């Protein structure tokens, strides 16, 4: 972990130094009377509705019609350097999902503080619109905090803390960035909760973009979580993955595993998924996905095919078939059909 942090620090200093020497900007006047240099706040949201059929024993062919998500957000910028965002979830148990301010003057180095996505896995930071299938992978759910394997409730892959990130070394005719990094310090308890033990989680990633649109990345997480019984459970995890998104083609694959203290405390666990998205027409894209979770020698495999009918940037319909071989369930083999409607405003 120390070697990773030192390497990332050296890259940040090198990349930021180059940017500062090459960039001259006009500094606005800072004053408590200043009212300019502020964007009009953008207000928006989206709704995801669904119908789900399952032939799993005890599912009663359900759950049927459901509202998966209603999200509302406000974002904007001040001085073009400071960005802010507040996001609410309106359905189910309404709550604040994101709130943060980010100093983002330079692409090479920015600082974000508040409540936001953990910097763990490629898929976790993605918007549900961009995942390609009806839900996040088992890997993200159990290893990034969407119903964690340790028993933490679904925190949407988020926590409260501070994070630095940036993109370094533009290369090629397109001047795409060779290296992306993120390093964050978090409470460890998830959203809308205070730190329970004074310790902090450290999560970081280092990613390389050797070709435009292709990222190879490694992620590390060292921390702990305090459950409702007051027990402190270690979270020590690694993740390795790749993603390719260009010209509407998508390939994404990741592998995550627990290590050291978490492995010895709660048993060995790992997960893997692979997703391929193929554009058929401008409005039709087909995804195929293999999703696997192993926890203490119990295994859940899920295979799916999903058609996305993207009729508009802000309108999408999905039809997905899922086959499960889930040894965590009493009747492991079952089929599901999901139909989803996405609308954004």
Question: Where are the regions a protein language model picked out?
Answer:
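Outer-membrane beta-barrel "beta-signal"
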Residues: 309, 333-345
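C-terminal hydrophobic structural anchor segments
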Residues: 277-327
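N-terminal periplasmic/intermembrane-space "pro-region" immediately following the signal or transit peptide
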Residues: 1-48, 345
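Outer membrane beta-barrel
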Residues: 29-188, 196-202, 207-216, 275-278, ...
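Detector for outer-membrane/organellar transmembrane beta-barrel domains
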Residues: 207-296
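A generic beta-sheet turn/junction motif
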Residues: 92, 244-248, 345
């Amino acid at each position: 972990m120390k070697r990773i942090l030192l390497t990332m620090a050296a890259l940040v200093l090198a990349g930021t130094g180059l940017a500062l020497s090459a960039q001259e900007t006009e500094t606005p006047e800072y004053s408590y009377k200043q009212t300019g240099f502020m964007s009009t706040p953008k207000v928006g949201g989206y709704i995801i509705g669904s119908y789900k059929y399952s032939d799993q024993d005890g599912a009663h062919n359900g759950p049927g019609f459901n509202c998966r998500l209603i999200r509302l957000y406000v974002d904007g910028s001040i001085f073009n350097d400071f960005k802010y965002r507040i996001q609410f979830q309106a359905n189910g148990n309404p709550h604040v999902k994101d709130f943060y301010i980010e100093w983002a003057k330079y692409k090479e180095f920015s600082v974000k503080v508040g409540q936001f996505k953990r910097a763990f896995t490629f898929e976790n930071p993605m918007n549900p619109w961009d995942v390609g299938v009806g839900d996040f992978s088992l890997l993200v759910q159990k290893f990034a905090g969407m119903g964690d394997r340790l028993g933490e409730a679904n925190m949407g892959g988020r926590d409260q803390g501070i994070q630095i990130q940036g993109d370094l070394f533009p290369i090629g005719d397109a001047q795409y960035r060779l290296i992306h990094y993120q390093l964050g310090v978090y409470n460890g308890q998830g959203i809308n909760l205070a730190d329970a033990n004074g310790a902090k989680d450290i999560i970081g990633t280092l990613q390389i973009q050797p070709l435009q649109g292709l990222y190879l990345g490694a992620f590390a997480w060292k921390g702990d979580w305090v459950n409702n019984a007051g027990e402190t459970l270690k979270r020590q995890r690694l993740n390795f993955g790749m993603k390719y998104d260009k010209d509407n083609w998508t390939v994404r694959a990741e592998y995550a595993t627990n290590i050291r203290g978490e492995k010895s405390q709660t048993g060995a666990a790992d997960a893997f998924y692979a997703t391929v998205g193929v554009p058929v027409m401008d409005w039709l894209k087909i995804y195929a996905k293999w999703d696997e979770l192993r926890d203490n020698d119990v295994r859940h495999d899920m295979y799916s095919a999903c058609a996305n009918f993207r009729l508009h940037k802000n309108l999408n319909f999905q039809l997905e078939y899922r086959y499960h071989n889930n040894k965590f369930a009493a009747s492991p083999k079952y089929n599901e059909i999901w139909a989803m409607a996405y609308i954004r405003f």
